Amino acid sequence: MLKLRYPLTFVLLLGACASAVAGPIAAGKQRVLGSEYSPSQSKDFTNDWDGDVPENAGKWGSVEAVRGQMNWGPLDEAYQLAKRNHMQFQFHCGLWGAQQPTWVRNLPPNEQRAAIEHWFAAIAQRYPDIDLMQVANETLPGHNQPDNRRADSGNYLRALGGTGATGVDWVLEAFRLARKYFPHTKLMINDYNVTEYNDQARQYLHTIQLLQQEHLIDAIGIQGHLSSNGPSVSVQRANLDLLASTGLPIYITEFDLDGRTDAQQLAAWQRFFPMFWEHPAVRGVNLWGFRHGLWRENEGAYLINYDGSERPALTWLRSYVASRP
C-alpha cells in the first residue's frame, strides 16, 4: 500500500492556493477579457481580468474640473494596477460630449483648442505606456458630441473644425492631434448602438474610413451595452462584419447585459457574448463592471452578489472562455 507523503489537509490547501492564483479568466487566450476599474469594482480585480479601463477617472472633467488643477490620483491607481500586473490598459477617454470641464465651455475657440492640446500633452507625459487610447467617444449624430447642449458637453466642436465638409471634420482633427501627442499609442474611436442598428453602423463606418484615409486610427471600439431583448445576433453579427471589413481590430469596450433574474442574465450572456468573443476581428472585451455599484445596477448587470457568490452567468463565462482558444 502506497503511503501518502503529505497529509490530505496540506494537499487540499495546495489546491485551494493554486485555484486562488490561477490567474485571469482569459489568461493565455487570444483575446483580452477585462473590466472597467473604479472603487466599486476594485476588489479582487486582478483575479479575473487582464484588461483595465478606468470608468470615470480618465474623463477630462474628472481630472481637470478646475482649470490647471489636475486630479490624477484615481487615474494613477488604474494605470499603475495595469502596469504592475501586465494588463492591457485602455484609456477612456480623450474627448467626449459629457463630463467635460465646465470652464472650457465659454472659452474662445482658439483657447479651447489650446486647452485640448494641453490635456492631451498632460496625459501623454504622465502615462507613456497606454496600450489603447479612446480618442473620441460617442461621436455619432444624436449621441454625445461636444456641442453646447449641456453645461458639461464641452462646447468645443467648432474649435476642432465643426462638422465641415465631411460631417465629422472635428473628429478627424481630434485624431490628428492625438496622433501628434500619442505617436506610439494605438488610437481608437468608441461608440454605442453600432451593432444593433444598421444606419448607425454605416455612419460609424463612414467616420472610420475617413480616419483610415489619413492613417489616424488603429482600432475600433464598440461599447456593447446590450439588452437581453435587443436586436438579433444575426443583425449584430452582420454589422460586426461590416466594421471588420475595414481590416481594423475591434474591441468591445463597455460590455454589459441586464439580468434581473439569474436565468434571464445567463440566457442573455449565452446568446450574445459568443457573438463577440468568437468573431475573428474582435481582439478583446471589457465589461462595464461586474460587481454591485456598476453603471447598470438597476438592470441587474452585476455578476457577483453582495455576499461574494457568483451569479450563473459568471460561472458560465469562466467555463466558456476556458473552452475557447
Residue ranges and their predicted role:
Residues 23-57:
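Boundary/entry segment of secreted carbohydrate-active catalytic domains
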Residues 47-65, 73-194, 242, 259-261:
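Substrate-binding cleft and catalytic face of glycoside hydrolase catalytic domains
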Residues 50-57, 131, 137, 185-191, ...:
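Aromatic- and acid-rich polysaccharide-binding/catalytic face
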Residues 36-48, 113-123, 198-211, 268-275:
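Short, acidic/polar
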Residues 1-8:
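Bacterial N-terminal signal peptides that target proteins for export
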Residues 25-27, 31-37, 132-135, 167-201, ...:
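Aromatic-lined carbohydrate-recognition surfaces of secreted/lumenal glycan-active proteins
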Residues 260-308:
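Substrate-binding cleft of secreted/luminal carbohydrate-active enzymes
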Residues 33-44, 60-73, 100-101, 140-142, ...:
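Acidic-and-aromatic substrate-binding clefts and catalytic sites of carbohydrate-active enzymes
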